[in-house]
Swiss-Prot record:
Broad enzyme group: oxidoreductase
Classification via InterPro entries: Cyt_P450, Cyt_P450_B, Cyt_P450_CS, Cyt_P450_sf
Top-level taxonomy: Bacteria, Bacillati, Actinomycetota, Actinomycetes, Mycobacteriales
Pathway the protein acts in: Steroid metabolism; cholesterol degradation
Keywords: Cholesterol metabolism, Heme, Iron, Lipid degradation, Lipid metabolism, Metal-binding, Monooxygenase, NADP, Oxidoreductase, Steroid metabolism, Sterol metabolism, Virulence
Keyword Heme: yes
Known role: Involved in the utilization of cholesterol as the sole carbon and energy source by degrading the side chain during infection. Primarily catalyzes the sequential oxidation of the terminal methyl of cholest-4-en-3-one into (25R)-26-hydroxycholest-4-en-3-one (alcohol), (25R)-26-oxocholest-4-en-3-one (aldehyde), to finally yield the carboxylic acid (25R)-3-oxocholest-4-en-26-oate. Also able to sequentially oxidize cholesterol itself, not only cholest-4-en-3-one.
Source organism: Mycobacterium tuberculosis (strain CDC 1551 / Oshkosh)
Protein name in UniProt: Steroid C26-monooxygenase
Length: 372
């Protein structure tokens, strides 16, 4: 497909860019490939910055970026490290767990939840909301799933508006307080905008990190030489994290809307139609990545597109990398003989075609005492 038709049409006529170069070329021309028509193939734009073009997108991004500065992310390192150890403490004596349910899912939800003013006892509720809301962003949503999503959004909306009001009255040091007070060129976020941008942060910060952590760890366990290599040389961890991101590509695709007729990588495209960017396919492009089907923690260079490219490059990439690094380092050190319950098993995936990853990953290891 990538070699013969870099931009192809599926059976429904939807155009899709499958090669690394085609995806990059589209992202370098936001004036031709617009976000403003919505990033899903069969849904209109939502009032959040991911569905905007500059200058509106740039202003919104500057306002939200106040909560994701390098210093603010660095300041969270100690608390995230402690959280990783707490999660491992909860399972280390058992000798078995579900890696997704017990480690990969709770970590990003706790981190993002803390930033959004979520108390520990509310995290499971937020995790359900996040899962239900992501389901809506997949194509072909049933009426039942649509209602579940609407109920989740209504509950999230009520919670977030109450949190916003509380932070306006009595600011703390959490992300909601930062966003409430953020100002660029005299502009501030309205309550409606705060609800939508924190929702984007919730979805973007929860499922993506969860799926990279679980899917990347699966590859380390299925490629035992790579696991052993990391244990012998922990300095290779940064490269391993990048390979986990390339391999899992948790955001599978996004759409752009054509603003004019054009021919693009051999395919005629019409103004007003959508073209899908296949990030996962681009991350396995043989023209860019040597032996792309090989999981290699020493891969260099590794210019993957897990965080996108261009003006919409993922704002939370530093936070995601920090979470992935801190948890993976601790899993390697504290659960050194971690292994899949069944090496030859096919693990279940979440039924989604936008943000997707492992639903469950049973693992076993030698029991050990908790740190706490």
């Amino acid at each position: 497909m990538r070699a013969n038709q870099p931009v192809f049409r599926d059976r429904n006529g939807l155009a899709a860019a499958s090669t690394y170069q085609a995806v990059i070329d589209a992202e370098r021309q936001p004036e031709l490939f617009s976000n403003a028509g919505g990033i899903r193939p069969d849904q209109p734009a939502l009032p959040m910055m991911i569905d905007m073009d500059d200058p509106a997108h740039l202003l919104r991004r500057k306002l939200v970026n106040a909560g994701f500065t390098r210093k603010r992310v660095k300041d969270k390192e100690a608390s995230i490290a402690a959280l990783c150890d707490t999660l491992i403490d909860a399972v280390c004596e058992r000798g078995e767990c579900d890696f997704v349910r017990d480690l990969a899912a709770p970590l990003p939800m706790a981190v993002i939840g803390d930033m959004l003013g979520v108390r520990p006892e509310q995290r499971d509720m937020f995790l359900r909301w996040s899962d239900d809301l992501v389901t809506f962003l997949s194509s072909h949503v049933s009426q039942e799933d649509f209602q579940i999503t609407m109920d989740a959004f209504a509950a999230y909306n009520d919670f977030t508006r109450a949190t916003i009001a509380a932070r306006r009255a009595d600011p703390t040091d959490d992300l909601v307080s930062v966003l409430v007070s953020s100002e660029v060129d005299g502009e501030r976020l309205s309550d409606d905008e705060l609800v939508m941008e924190t929702l984007l942060i919730l979805i973007g910060g929860d499922e993506t990190t969860r799926h990279t952590l679980s899917g990347g760890t699966e590859q380390l366990l299925r490629n035992r030489d790579q696991w052993d290599l990391l244990q012998r040389d922990p300095s290779l961890l940064p490269g391993a994290i990048e390979e986990m991101l390339r391999w899992t590509a948790p955001v599978k695709n996004m759409c752009r809307v054509l603003t004019a007729d054009t021919e693009f990588h051999g395919t005629a495209l019409c103004a007003g139609e959508k073209m899908m960017l296949l990030f996962e396919s681009a991350n396995f492009d043989e023209a860019v990545f040597c032996e792309p089907e090989k999981f290699d923690v020493q891969r260099n260079p590794n210019s993957h597109l897990a965080f996108g490219f261009g003006t919409h490059f993922c704002l939370g990439n530093q936070l995601a990398r920090l979470e992935l690094s801190l948890m993976t380092e601790r899993v390697l050190r504290r659960l050194p003989d971690l292994r899949l319950v069944a090496d030859d098993s096919v693990l279940p995936l979440r039924p989604a075609n936008f943000v997707s990853g492992l639903e469950s990953m049973p693992v076993v290891f030698t029991p050990s005492p908790p740190l706490g």
